[in-house]
């Protein structure tokens, strides 16, 4: 791989290869990002605009079509929404606050409100809000009705909007061509992994790199602030340019107090953020006029920071739980695992991403459930006991795991990798009060690969929370955000994909499996051909999706464009089993 063409390692995106799926887009875009501020300042997002075309009023245009073009032009935020303001009367152009709340609608329906005349007409605009766009391109998923009026006036023979609500309304379809989701990466609190912070960026800007770096130095979105580190000091600045060879160059000032380790971690942030958004390296990085780190005087490649690769996949053979036993795929057959896992009835199990440590829920029938933890060849250690336990889930590595007891008590299990001794710490779940409904029961709780978030199913609905760290080192759930509006209360299983999206299995025969982005901006139904709901378990290794439906353990090859049906996993034929991959 040449320096000039170095790119980030990319995992296979489920939604890009499933040509047979029905895309149900909750597509969204970014909030208004300043286009005319100095790119050297922390608060800046991009240099001058690229001049991407937006619709303009045409001579003699009918009022309803002009209103529709206004909404399309509203998707172009440059110069204080100059493109959209061309559709307003002169007086309204100065009064409309285009920095007001921005709402994304699933559709925009327009109908006249009473009889109009040659000089005035009022239209009623309706739709469903699928999300709002916050500062820095943060998408906040919602699903509420929207309805309001837009008044129009004929000015010198041309229709213009004379009165409208103080809000920016966008049709989701406009985002397909004008906005793209990008990941800004921040280190976890221990500096061992990069955590994605998904943002929506307007594409009509000259420098994607400048936009990304400005968002990075501005810091993580509010929801992530207690789950990640922000290495850039408040008074620091960053300037983005291209060097003489056309390669990206990022020059920081104000980093004198950062340690060598922190500078290397910041370099990883920048390189993987740019590489993940198709800004090709190599990358020149400097801090206060000197190389970012003393040991790196040349340009940076992703290979130089491979230990922080946010897309790395843990390759392990498929395992499965069936009839209380744990099996491992071994060539053309499934082999029952021996050791302590074979000495009790295993209801569910999780495999750590490293070191092959198992966390298993044991017990059956009316007996209490017991969590047991240990490597395959070791003696296990007993931990949480309750009437019911969710399938356990590991964090970033084998030093911490999580389980939910009796649908409500979330416990973090800490494990000493040397001695194998475990401890238990209660996770503060007081933010669950923000979830609607009574008798809230957590049936699924799965921690992301970077350890910073968890997806959970509460009474059939899908939520994402951050795992915040408190001052005393314990964990606390961040505010739950419902991301699965498309599946309603039909969800029965969920797990993380390698690209950071969430796979969801449901009890709906017409839509048994979904892929949902972590910010709730996009939901996509995956083909259900040859599946029978409910889908009680889901997992993916990037090349195959595994699910347990009403009949068997099934697989779908996402790397093959010829795949049209789910097939039974050959090694587990005749057994109804749940898939197990490394967390």
Curated annotation (Swiss-Prot):
Belongs to the LpqB lipoprotein family. Residues 1-29 form the signal peptide. Keywords: Cell membrane, Lipoprotein, Membrane, Palmitate, Signal. It comes from the Bacteria. It is a lipid-anchor. Its main location: membrane. It is found in: Cell membrane. A lipid is attached at residue 30 (N-palmitoyl cysteine). The gene is lpqB. Transmembrane segments: none annotated. This is Lipoprotein LpqB. Residues 38-63 are annotated as: Disordered. The lineage of its organism: Bacteria, Bacillati, Actinomycetota, Actinomycetes, Mycobacteriales. A lipid is attached at residue 30 (S-diacylglycerol cysteine). SUPFAM superfamilies: DPP6 N-terminal domain-like. Disulfide bonds: none annotated. GO terms for cellular component: plasma membrane.
């Amino acid at each position: 791989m040449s320096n000039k063409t170095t790119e980030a390692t990319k995992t296979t995106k489920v939604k890009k290869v499933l040509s047979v799926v029905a895309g149900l887009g909750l597509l969204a875009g970014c909030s208004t990002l300043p286009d005319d501020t100095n790119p050297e300042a922390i608060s800046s997002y991009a240099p001058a605009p690229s001049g991407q075309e937006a619709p303009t009023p045409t001579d003699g245009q009918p009022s309803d079509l002009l209103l529709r073009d206004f909404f399309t032009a509203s998707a172009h935020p440059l110069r204080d929404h100059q493109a959209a303001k061309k559709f307003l009367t002169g007086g309204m152009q100065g009064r409309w606050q285009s920095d007001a709340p921005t709402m994304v609608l699933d559709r925009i329906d327009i109908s006249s409100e009473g009889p109009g005349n040659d000089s005035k007409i009022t239209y009623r605009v309706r739709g469903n809000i699928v999300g709002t766009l916050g500062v820095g391109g943060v998408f906040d998923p919602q699903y509420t009705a929207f309805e309001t009026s837009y008044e129009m006036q004929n000015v010198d023979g041309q229709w213009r909007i004379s009165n409208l609500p103080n809000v920016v309304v966008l049709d989701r379809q406009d985002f397909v061509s004008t906005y793209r989701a990008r990941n800004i990466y921040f280190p976890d609190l221990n500096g061992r992994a990069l955590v994605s912070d998904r943002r929506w960026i307007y594409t009509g800007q000259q420098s994607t790199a400048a936009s990304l770096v400005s968002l990075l130095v501005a810091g993580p979105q509010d929801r992530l602030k207690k789950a990640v580190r922000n290495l850039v000091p408040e008074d620091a600045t960053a300037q983005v340019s291209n060097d003489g060879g056309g390669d990206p160059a990022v020059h920081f000032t104000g980093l004198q107090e950062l340690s060598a380790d922190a500078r290397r971690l910041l370099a990883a942030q920048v390189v993987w953020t740019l590489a993940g958004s198709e800004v090709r390296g190599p990358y020149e990085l400097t801090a206060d006029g000197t190389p970012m780190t003393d040991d790196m005087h040349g340009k940076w490649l992703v290979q130089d920071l491979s230990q922080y690769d946010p897309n790395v996949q843990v390759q392990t053979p498929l395992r499965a739980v069936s009839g209380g036993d744990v099996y491992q795929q071994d060539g053309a057959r499934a082999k029952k695992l021996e050791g302590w896992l074979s000495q009790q009835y295993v209801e569910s199990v999780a495999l750590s991403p490293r070191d092959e440590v198992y966390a298993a829920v044991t017990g059956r029938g009316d007996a209490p459930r017991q969590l047991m933890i240990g490597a395959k060849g070791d003696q296990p250690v007993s931990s949480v006991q309750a009437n019911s336990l969710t399938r356990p889930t590991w964090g970033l590595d084998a030093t911490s795991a999580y389980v939910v007891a009796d649908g409500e008590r979330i416990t973090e299990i800490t494990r000493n990798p040397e001695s194998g001794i475990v401890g238990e710490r209660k996770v503060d779940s007081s933010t669950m009060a923000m979830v609607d409904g009574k008798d809230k029961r957590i049936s699924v709780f799965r921690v992301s690969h970077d350890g910073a978030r968890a997806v959970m199913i509460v009474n059939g609905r899908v939520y994402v929370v951050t795992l915040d760290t408190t001052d005393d080192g314990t964990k606390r759930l961040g505010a739950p955000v419902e991301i699965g509006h498309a599946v309603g209360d039909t969800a029965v299983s969920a797990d993380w994909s390698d690209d950071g999206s969430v796979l969801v299995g449901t009890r709906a025969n017409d839509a048994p499996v979904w892929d949902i982005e972590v910010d709730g901006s996009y939901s996509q139904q995956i083909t259900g051909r040859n599946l029978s709901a409910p889908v009680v378990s889901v997992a993916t290794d990037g090349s195959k999706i595994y699910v347990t439906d009403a009949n068997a353990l099934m697989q779908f090859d996402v790397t093959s464009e010829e795949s049209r049906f789910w097939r039974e996993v050959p090694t587990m034929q005749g057994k109804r089993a749940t898939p197990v991959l490394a967390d």
